[in-house]
Design a protein with these regions (language model features):
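Extended, helix-rich architectural segments
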Residues: 1-139
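Structured, contiguous alpha/beta core segments that scaffold functional sites
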Residues: 3-12, 16-17, 113-241
Length: 241
């Protein structure tokens, strides 16, 4: 089930984010990420039956997978995005320039990937950015396993910033750090976060992204961000057994 991650609005300053709180939010989401990875595994056909062991070693153990998870997600995505979204001019506006930008960003493919991510994970994230060395905007769908939105602690739950991160382990030193990209309305933080006995340490670079709004958009499949087959996994397991 979707978990709202919050950051206290009182004292919030996008120019001075509290690194220890960012680190804590990442560790909380990293726990949730294991559930999201399991949903992706079911879509890819990696089901519980593949790890099944018979009590009687002489009994057959076929481990056959009927991938209903993929069938459900692909069918739902096909119904939702089988026909690309159409954008039309109105009497009040001319969106030809916008449509040209959408064509350049291959927005139909991004929409389709977002729809599939919603079917699998119950959520999707789209990142808007300027192409390197250019002023044109581009768009891409990014992995929900490594992305989350952070809201304020008010009743309205207004978005404050988005985080895209990945974990880096050093087995020789038995240490773990997180590479994180944090986007507020105006700033892009590049952080390297690690926890030590003396607290959270980090390297940080901050640059303006000049978009005037958080450049990561969150889409939810429903209010609770439940995937299309998430509540059918026990039935899928029973069928495959």
């Amino acid at each position: 089930m979707y978990q709202y991650l919050t950051y206290p609005r009182d004292g919030y300053d996008e120019g001075s984010l509290k690194k220890d709180l960012i680190y804590k939010l990442i560790t909380i989401h990293n726990t949730e990420s294991s559930r999201l990875k399991n949903l992706k595994s079911y879509y890819m056909g990696d089901h519980a039956i593949l790890n099944h062991k018979r009590r009687n070693v002489n009994a057959p153990n076929y481990k056959t997978v009927a991938n209903h998870a993929k069938d459900i997600a692909d069918t739902a995505t096909g119904y939702f995005m089988g026909n690309p979204i159409k954008y039309n001019n109105t009497a009040d506006s001319d969106i030809d320039e916008l449509l040209t930008a959408f064509d350049g960003a291959e927005i139909d493919q991004v929409d389709a990937q977002n729809a599939l991510n919603m079917a699998i994970y119950g959520r999707a994230y789209e990142y808007i950015y300027a192409k390197e060395g250019m002023t044109e905007l581009d768009s891409t769908s990014i992995d929900p396993e490594n992305t989350f939105m952070v809201y304020d602690d008010s009743i309205e739950r207004k978005p404050l910033f988005a985080v895209y991160y990945y974990e880096v382990k050093d087995d020789t030193k038995d240490t773990t750090k997180y590479q994180a990209e944090v986007f507020t309305e105006n700033l892009h933080y590049h952080m390297v976060l690690r926890s030590t006995d003396s607290g959270t340490t980090q390297n940080e670079q901050v640059t303006p992204h000049n978009l005037g709004q958080i450049p990561i958009i969150e889409y939810r499949n429903n209010h609770f961000a439940i995937g299309d087959y998430e509540q059918q996994i026990s039935l899928i397991d029973a069928y495959n057994s």
